[in-house]
Design a protein with these regions (language model features):
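Extracellular/periplasmic, surface-exposed regions of secreted and cell-surface proteins
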Residues: 1-21, 33-335, 340, 368, ...
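Core alpha/beta catalytic barrel or barrel-like domain that forms the active/cofactor pocket
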Residues: 27-28, 136
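Short Pro/Gly-enriched beta-strand edge/turn motifs at strand-loop
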Residues: 361-365
Length: 385
């Protein structure tokens, strides 16, 4: 009823690109339009090596009317990405000879290495009673290298309950299965690589062939991971003999907070911007519907159809007095996907106003035109076997 597993996996990804422009080509090279006319050559290489290790202790036990199922584990995720790019500058010294060595001036070279490491501990436990009532709890704690050294750790839980009424009440024969469920969870997203760690930027041929090293112009701050708190309720019903028609409906509510922005600050600090959390919060509400059917099922052939429908909208749950948009359509409860533009001025009779240049006068203020999120998303799949 208990077993130990060790899993290890990795992916090696490599991408090599070569760009050639012969002398006289009218195209924009890395150094400008003139590079194309004088000939141009570029080589770039990108390689990525993500690796993941996981140690899992799994257990499953039946105790009379009760069942216990779960796992405890830990994982190590490590990724390293290397980018190398080189290109000629101001043309090719020998037309038709495509090589970095053929650069008229010192070639432009760019190299970058990014690494990230995430250590995790996690566990999940599912308790069942009479194959009808279920309680599931999950906890996970991550330590990410992209977060501040004094606040690398973050925890996110999950709790779910479900009941199968078809096991305890009498239903028509054409409803063989019915399930109700609800869940609550918190998920967090760490930062991108080097969002906080500053490193010198090296530039070539800045002044008479001299190279320069400049410190980043953004200020490191204590930034918390972006957090989503979600609750969901749903039901699943199967119809007809053999469960040939299935309907699943769910409603979800997802609150997002600890959002981050890059905020401009006074250059007197020695920097131009600062990565920071803001107080603005959003809530996304939506409905998802899934319908699975088997219209045809004979001994040697079956046809399965799956239809998925979803609709959701995101609203402001809280505004930040300093950073939230200042307009008439931004308020708590308003949608966040507003689309606006500056239209044209009209007189009281509805006629367009013509300015002194003979053109329609552009309004100084933006107007709300509509919203960008789709009203409905859907997908249809057919499987023949």
């Amino acid at each position: 009823w208990m077993k130990l597993q060790l899993r290890a996996g990795g992916v090696a990804y490599a991408n090599n690109n070569v760009t050639r422009s012969s002398v006289g080509t009218i195209s924009k090279g890395r150094g400008g339009w003139e590079d194309g006319a004088l000939g141009y050559y570029n080589e770039s290489q990108k390689a990525s090596f993500p690796i993941n290790y996981a140690l899992l202790l799994l257990f499953n036990k039946e105790l009379s009317d009760f069942s216990v199922d779960g796992l405890l584990g830990g994982s190590l995720y490590y990724t390293k990405t290397k980018n190398l790019e080189a290109s000629t500058k101001n043309g090719l010294s020998v037309p038709g000879f495509y090589s970095i060595k053929a650069s008229v001036e010192s070639p432009i070279v760019d190299a970058e290495t990014k690494t990230k490491k995430v250590n995790s501990l996690f566990g999940t436990l599912t308790l069942g009673y009479k194959d009808t009532y279920y309680l599931e709890a999950t906890g996970r704690n991550d330590w990410s290298s992209t977060l501040p050294s004094n606040d690398k750790s973050y925890f996110y839980p999950f709790v779910g309950v479900s009941i199968i009424p078809s096991n305890i009440i009498s239903l028509p024969d054409w409803i063989p299965f019915w399930k109700l469920r609800g869940s609550w969870t918190v998920s967090k997203t760490d930062l991108a690589i080097y969002d906080l760690d500053r490193a010198y930027t090296i530039k070539q041929n800045v002044w008479d062939g001299l190279n320069t090293a400049s410190y980043p112009d953004y200020l490191r701050g204590d930034v918390k991971p972006i957090t989503n708190r979600t609750w969901e309720i749903g039901t699943g019903i199967h119809f007809l003999q053999g469960h040939r028609l299935k309907l699943d409906v769910s409603y979800f509510n997802k609150l997002t907070y600890n959002n981050t922005i890059s905020q401009r600050i006074s250059s007197a600090t020695g920097y131009k911007s600062r990565l920071m959390n803001i107080d603005e919060e959003y809530v996304r509400r939506g409905v998802e519907i899934s319908i699975d059917a088997t219209p045809v099922q004979v001994r040697d052939f079956s046809w399965d159809v799956s239809l998925n429908l979803s609709t959701s909208k995101r609203y402001y749950a809280k505004l930040d007095e300093s950073f939230s948009p200042d307009n008439l359509w931004t308020y708590v409860g308003a949608r966040t996907d507003s689309y606006s533009y500056k239209g044209y001025d009209k007189d009281p009779d509805g006629n367009y106003i013509i300015n002194t240049n003979g053109l329609m006068s552009r309004s100084q203020y933006s107007s709300l035109i509509g919203y960008t999120d789709p009203d409905l998303e859907y997908g249809l799949a057919n499987v023949f076997k």
